[in-house]
């Protein structure tokens, strides 16, 4: 066991984490040159395209060190984005060490810091690495100063490397072996294995990626999952050297996979503990929690007959993404669809994109909303994640909205514009610190304000230099109201929005104006109104299209013309009573886009 090292790589988006992983795998001969492609561990097309890591992956590598000993290195690739922070904490708790990769030309960024603090809290040894030192803009001294200043770990002897050219990658591994302690654990104790990740394979069912903490596991043994108490019999165990390789057994300190004929992914929850069914461990490993979705949106098929196909696609996605939640819902305007819960905005975009790309779905997505806590006048508290489910204003005692703590990092030139943005978003400043040229701002901002377009706006006011991460803090009483949109006096549920009272007039007017542009003219007048409860706050009219009924009367008597006009008016009136206004798809998307222009 002294020769095993379990480590993961922490880095901000684009600081070269996956490239470094590629180089390490190449150096240890995990794949032949023919099979080597860039970003080996990012197996989803989407991960490659966006250059982000979504699911955790592992590689068990052998490395002959300079002292002649052969070490087993287990690389656990973690997602770097804040939406997947629970997956990150699980991956990190399976390691004893983490390589902190910092781009020498850019210095420390927000997500790096967030994940690094997680690592330090979990007691993981952090080894700083400066990447991209081959760039002309690289400034290693500055980056070292930032690591020490912001994160507070000693970085004087940080390894310098360039993952692109392969320069210094061996030094990274040597430094890893020297600094990271070998795993502790007893191969003869009762089995305890932490599930780092799980996914569904069409041939063998659910594959669980685990780190064995204590004990030994062999095929044909009975195992039990401690969160659900479900029992299964093990078919295969093994490791990934990115390719899978079956082994006789997995013992304490190793990272590998278990295949046990599990049919649904919900049984194998990330962070759960696997143990033997008979000689089971007295207690599960700490840190397991159910992941709660933070952001909700409705997904509807563009064609109503695609509903079943959408349900199947969601079921298949759920096999690989246990944090996705969905339930069927019906909207008067959009027909049948699903209300889906996501970890955050990036997660939502990825799910949408995967549905469109892998399953060929055409989707309409309603505006993302967060979960509000509503205390009713009879004292009961309900959680509302859909504006249509919000009770009538008379029955509400108070509404509490989720508040998140946001950490922002940016060069000092952009502090002013970022502060202005946070103020617009009803943020309260908690803290502000200068680290060299970088500034760290801490704000408390309502989650609803972040969900819409905070991230995009932040990138645009700071020219892409600011980075952020957020975590949920608490529910706080707030003056939020539900704005309904009425078309000819009928509520359109899919267009309802929940906003702060201070912005309700403005937003109501804006949505109404937008709808006027988008809804095509009908044969009769259409009134678009925005209302809070029974109180109308904005109105727009769409004028009717009319045929020129007087075209055939040259000259002639005025009463004849009047008769024809009256007749037309009557017809329009009748039409208006029976007609229903077609609302085009763009109207729903427009709601998303009016957010704070």
UniProtKB/Swiss-Prot annotation:
GO terms for molecular function: GTP binding; GTPase activity; guanosine tetraphosphate binding; ribosome binding; translation elongation factor activity. CDD domains: EF4_II (cd03699), EF4_III (cd16260), LepA (cd01890), lepA_C (cd03709). It is a peripheral membrane protein. GTP binds at residues 14-19, 131-134. The keyword Cell membrane applies. It catalyses: GTP + H2O = GDP + phosphate + H(+). One of its GO terms (biological process) is positive regulation of translation. Its EC number is 3.6.5.n1. Residues 2-184 form the tr-type G domain. Disulfide bonds: none annotated. Gene3D superfamilies: 3.30.70.240, Elongation factor 4, C-terminal domain (3.30.70.2570), Elongation Factor G (Translational Gtpase), domain 3 (3.30.70.870), P-loop containing nucleotide triphosphate hydrolases (3.40.50.300), Translation factors (2.40.30.10). One of its GO terms (cellular component) is plasma membrane. InterPro entries: EF-4, EFG_III/V, EFG_V-like, EFTu-like_2, G_TR_CS, LepA_C_sf, LepA_CTD, LepA_IV. Keywords: Cell inner membrane, Cell membrane, GTP-binding, Hydrolase, Membrane, Nucleotide-binding, Protein biosynthesis. The keyword Chloroplast does not apply. It is found in: Cell inner membrane. PROSITE patterns: G_TR_1, G_TR_2. NCBIfam families: lepA, small_GTP. Required for accurate and efficient protein synthesis under certain stress conditions. May act as a fidelity factor of the translation reaction, by catalyzing a one-codon backward translocation of tRNAs on improperly translocated ribosomes. Back-translocation proceeds from a post-translocation (POST) complex to a pre-translocation (PRE) complex, thus giving elongation factor G a second chance to translocate the tRNAs correctly. Binds to ribosomes in a GTP-dependent manner. PANTHER family: TRANSLATION FACTOR GUF1 HOMOLOG, CHLOROPLASTIC, TRANSLATION FACTOR GUF1-RELATED. Belongs to the TRAFAC class translation factor GTPase superfamily. Classic translation factor GTPase family. LepA subfamily. This is Elongation factor 4. The gene is lepA.
